């Protein structure tokens, strides 16, 4: 049973969340977990102006995802930063290249799940995940969120990410915040939750 985590991260927040998602998925017996990043679309000079070059270098060891890997997976957990309440352009361009999979019905019946980040507490995390779900549903995927069985969603003693739609984290306007332990716990729970359902469906 193969679980694919496909993400884009500019400053490392989604990368760290992806690692936590993978940790959770690997807790499920029989789960083969792959972490992949979607292709970068911004030129090097733009990344340099945005102060993202060093982080990109740190993630260089993560293989770039191919369209074929989506078809090979039993479950796909996507990670994207929020861009104006939607998925980032890099993820959008990657998914726009999946028309061939749609024509063949290659993703029909596979599990799909999403996690995200935003600069601010109300920066569009829920709209990003919900609008992402539209693409998954058009592909015939079965959408999985983050249930309230994860008790960390009920905390009000600190600023946290996460919703029933998926795990999330708040990066800060300058990227100064790292995912909190609660955010990472949510990501682990989501990874394990998706992998557990995939394992049951694979029997």
From Swiss-Prot:
It comes from the Bacteria. Keywords: Flavoprotein, FMN, NAD, NADP, Nucleotide-binding, Oxidoreductase. Residues 3-194 form the Flavodoxin-like domain. Its EC number is 1.6.5.2. HAMAP family: NQOR. One of its GO terms (molecular function) is NADPH dehydrogenase (quinone) activity. InterPro entries: Flavodoxin/NO_synth (IPR008254), Flavoprotein-like_sf (IPR029039), Flavoprotein_WrbA-like (IPR010089), FMN_Rdtase-like_dom (IPR005025), NQO (IPR037513). Belongs to the WrbA family. SUPFAM superfamilies: Flavoproteins. One of its GO terms (cellular component) is membrane. This is NAD(P)H dehydrogenase (quinone). NAD(+) binds at residue 11. Its cofactor is FMN. NCBIfam families: flav_wrbA, PRK03767.1. It is an enzyme of class 1 (oxidoreductase). FMN binds at residues 9-14, 82-84, 117-123, 138. It catalyses: a quinone + NADH + H(+) = a quinol + NAD(+); a quinone + NADPH + H(+) = a quinol + NADP(+).
